[in-house]
């Protein structure tokens, strides 16, 4: 029977790099707009792509992020027109981000402490992915399911000697 430390590898999935979460999530495009586009265009794109945010790029570089929350708070509640308002007027800048080497726990901490639902992943100057709060919740659920499975196997004595 394996010892309890052998189970610890399954409990430390939060220490895995964001790169592992992106790999598990699969290759999803990161949708973007420029600061000069209308908020209407950005919201239309989010709706068509079924995403809650877009990265804002200037010359291929991350300039900010625009989300449904930005739209609700900075356009709708202020009585502004989405067809006349530019993305640059409501985007969140500078955008918070993580690198692929940061841990899943780091990403969770940033999202929780800063109360954001989306976090771009930057490798150098390139946006290589987007984490959502849903991605992190799925990671937690999968991690807990794996831990439960391994604990059941451990209790049942199904680990090799």
Give the label of every model feature segment.
Residues 1-161:
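Tandem CBS (Cystathionine beta-synthase) repeat/Bateman regulatory domains
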